[in-house]
Amino acid sequence: MYSVNGNCFRISVRNLVEFMCAEGDIDNRNTGSNDVKIMQEGARIHRKIQHSMGTMYHAEVPLKIEIPLVSDLGIEYVLQVEGRADGIIADINYDEDGNKEPESDAIIDEIKTMQTDVSLLKEPVYVHKAQALVYGYIYASQKKLSKIGIQMTYVTPEPETINKFLEEYTFERIEEWFNKLITGFKRWTDYTFDERHKRTESIRELKFPYEYREGQKNLCVSVYRAIEDNTNLYIQAPTGVGKTLSTVFPAVQALGQQMSDKIFYLTSKTIT
């Protein structure tokens, strides 16, 4: 879904809009499918449409934006949003009178395959359109465009049916929409970094709860160094030496030093 590396919160465009813009419906035929055959058919149709659009159509365009933010506790971090636009029409055709068709500096094309009859759609599914809008904002801001077209291309595989929706946005309008999206999502990213900060401060104050047994401190040091060096450590120690605490405690300390983000402690059912 997302990843946090240091002070960078990284999320894909699709995961961002699905988290922020998804609307409830028990009918998931309009929101995609995990069926392998359907996904393969959708990929084939994507390629077919992309190849039919000519030289002006740029397929699978990678886009990324980094947004500097500050949490409620004053933690500075970067929100990185990235993904691939299905298509971008960067050069627009001109009609006989020399006018652009349509009047946009570029068009973002988002292609969605559905199992329902797309000809019955009256408007784009909002979460799909939101994905295209994010791509549109990133592209328009980086290319300094005054306006951009957002096109949703819906396809039903059998019988093959295509339904398109095209809407033009000024940069000010799409920027306002994007800023509202990020402001809403910032609540969650702020929480992530603020809680990490609280956790780190708590770990730094943590002391080993007992007096070290014989060999226990050396074991803690070995585990910590293995985590620090990102290496495996194999330990053979007698029962009663305190292996559980001697491995978990240095792992928690390493967590406080941001050497890792999570701890997984796996053990057998009856012994540790």
Predicted regions mapped to residue ranges:
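Metal-dependent nuclease catalytic cores that hydrolyze phosphodiester bonds in DNA/RNA
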Residues: 1-95
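Mg2+/Mn2+-dependent nuclease catalytic core
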Residues: 70-175
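Conserved pre-motif I regulatory segment
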Residues: 193-236
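Walker A/P-loop
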Residues: 228-250, 262-263
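Post-Walker A helix-loop "phosphate-sensing" segment adjacent to the P-loop in P-loop NTPases
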Residues: 254-260
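Conserved Walker A/P-loop ATP-binding site and its immediately adjacent core
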Residues: 262-272
